[in-house]
Amino acid sequence: MKGIPSSSNQILNQDLVEDQSFELEDWLPITASRNANWYYSAFHNVTAIVGAGVLGLPYAMSELGWGPGVVVLILSWVITLYTFWQMIEMHEMFEGKRFDRYHELGQAAFGKKLGLYIVVPLQLLVETSACIVYMVTGGESLKKIHQLSVGDYECRKLKVRHFILIFASSQFVLSLLKNFNSISGVSLVAAVMSMSYSTIAWVASLTKGVANNVEYGYKRRNNTSVPLAFLGALGEMAFAYAGHNVVLEIQATIPSTPENPSKRPMWKGAIVAYIIVAFCYFPVALVGFWTFGNNVEENILKTLRGPKGLIIVANIFVIIHLMGSYQVYAMPVFDMIESVMIKKWHFSPTRVLRFTIRWTFVAATMGIAVALPHFSALLSFFGGFIFAPTTYFIPCIIWLILKKPKRFSLSWCINWICIILGVLVMIIAPIGGLAKLMNALKQPDSSCKST
């Protein structure tokens, strides 16, 4: 590890560190604390994966149809679990070296400069776009609560943009937490909330039963053609599996010894997390589509009309979960920016620097969310364009470079299949996502029912 450069050899405040022989890694939010264990891994990963994407899965199913929808849903779960395992295995693949950040693993595979150029922009875009979507979803949930509480007429006075501002206020406070382990309590509550609102969504749908005159065929919606909607749905599915962008950062919080490497508790936590993911995703996607067919809305909780109290509770759970999810994705961004500010620009690592960086980021994501409050369109575009590479095929490319499996062996073939499928999603899904986003921008942000 490298300490603070001599050109900025300031003495840190006593409230930041006790030892004046300061190491940068001991201050940055990803590596400041390494006392986590397998269940920290489990709930951090649940919080990271089961996010806003689960609420859009029934809508994605309606755009894909039963056959393709089920295939894509299952295939995505299997492929992403495999690439998740790859990243955990590669965290300490070289003795005495831990790849605590995604871009460090990329540098090991592609070279010091090229690795940064490939991974850092994608990871920043993934984490920033996730935070933007969570801002939008939090605002939508707050608006739904307001609508159910005061009625449609009164709710028309406020748009979803106003509720995004309210949700953002919580992130200005939570962003003050120092590192990954300091948000463990928030992440645990968020994980429980994600399971709770997912359960409410599919149980309420199942209890309601199949809607009258339900249809499962393809239909044109929101001025988006059926083929473009189909492509966009692939991006929505990809968005639902975004945990890979923080997996190494989560593993970095787990202690490691030669006798008990960090990959053991991390993989144990990942298995638990993916079982929970399956419990959340499959019932919500399948039961939601079965109940409402192609009349399901972009957010399944917006489709459910009652009982009113249950829908309010579900949206409260969504809001609490998103408070934690936002921080899980924002923490690596804070780590990158703080590292650059201290290493390259020689800023002193103080609370003022930390708060300035974090509040600026929260304000920026809030501003973009207010400008583009379109849930499904954002899922489609971001999911295909930037989530697919970091989740579906970059781990496989790195594995082929570093592990060098024998050509045409099982490992080699599996990785190339994942790469081909991931590249296809990256190319075609943003086409549908961009079309949906352009059409969404033409729609007014007016009544409660429409937004």
Swiss-Prot record:
Residues 62-63, 137-159, 204-227, 291-309, 380, 435-451 are extracellular. InterPro entries: AA_transpt_TM. It is found in: Cell membrane. This is Lysine histidine transporter-like 3. GO terms for biological process: amino acid transport. Residues 1-40, 85-115, 178-182, 249-269, 331-358, 402-413 are cytoplasmic. It holds the Pfam family Aa_trans. It comes from the Eukaryota. The keyword Ubl conjugation does not apply. PANTHER family: OS05G0424000 PROTEIN-RELATED. Keywords: Amino-acid transport, Cell membrane, Membrane, Transmembrane, Transmembrane helix, Transport. Amino acid transporter. Belongs to the amino acid/polyamine transporter 2 family. Amino acid/auxin permease (AAAP) (TC 2.A.18.2) subfamily. GO terms for cellular component: plasma membrane. The chain crosses the membrane at residues 41-61, 64-84, 116-136, 160-177, 183-203, 228-248, 270-290, 310-330, 359-379, 381-401, 414-434. It is a multi-pass membrane protein.
